[in-house]
């Protein structure tokens, strides 16, 4: 998992409440047995004028010119500004996968659905919670100033606005540790590989029959 320490990026505003996971990555794209390739279908039903299907060449699609991520001023955005209850709906880990693979490193919103919130941390995507008043002000500034960027300093737990003003945010210590070091669940487990190997060796020494395979 990619480390998250300090990130400066262009902000794209998703000015809708209750954006659910089916809007983030529609159900027809969940058939893939791979963990990659979801970025082109992020917000698929809003992003394109034609219906999408798995394996389709994105270059053959008809982009919706009115959708925020298709507007030239937000090309290359890596921070998504959203409204309350972002990521509600069904429990699909594909939602943070799609956001990450599109290029987003962080989301800033007043609130999130719990499962989406947890899945985001586990996949290297930082979901930041700010008060609605601060979110509203950020929307005003992003809309008013093309090329609006923010700097997110996870170590210090602050968002730095273009003029230098800092907005503090909270993050649970263990989640912060994992993001700073790029540890997902597998990475955390592998850090204990010596202890795991020692346990297996001790177990086989005490119960050697466990090392025998059953003839086919």
Curated annotation (Swiss-Prot):
Primary enzyme class: lyase
CDD domains: IPMI_Swivel
Matching Pfam families: Aconitase_C (PF00694)
Gene Ontology biological process terms from the UniProt entry: L-leucine biosynthetic process
Key words of the record: Amino-acid biosynthesis, Branched-chain amino acid biosynthesis, Leucine biosynthesis, Lyase
InterPro entries the record matches: 3-IsopropMal_deHydase_ssu, Aconitase/3IPM_dehydase_swvl, AconitaseA/IPMdHydase_ssu_swvl, IPMI_Swivel, LeuD
Any single Gene Ontology cellular-component annotation: 3-isopropylmalate dehydratase complex
UniProt keyword annotation of Lyase present: yes
GO MF annotations, alphabetized: 3-isopropylmalate dehydratase activity
Catalysed reaction, written as an equation: (2R,3S)-3-isopropylmalate = (2S)-2-isopropylmalate
EC number: 4.2.1.33
Listed pathway(s): Amino-acid biosynthesis; L-leucine biosynthesis; L-leucine from 3-methyl-2-oxobutanoate: step 2/4
HAMAP family: LeuD_type1
Assembly behavior: Heterodimer of LeuC and LeuD.
Biological function: Catalyzes the isomerization between 2-isopropylmalate and 3-isopropylmalate, via the formation of 2-isopropylmaleate.
PANTHER family listed in its UniProt record: 3-ISOPROPYLMALATE DEHYDRATASE SMALL SUBUNIT (PTHR43345:SF5), 3-ISOPROPYLMALATE DEHYDRATASE SMALL SUBUNIT 2-RELATED-RELATED (PTHR43345)
Family affiliation: Belongs to the LeuD family. LeuD type 1 subfamily.
Name of the molecule in the record: 3-isopropylmalate dehydratase small subunit
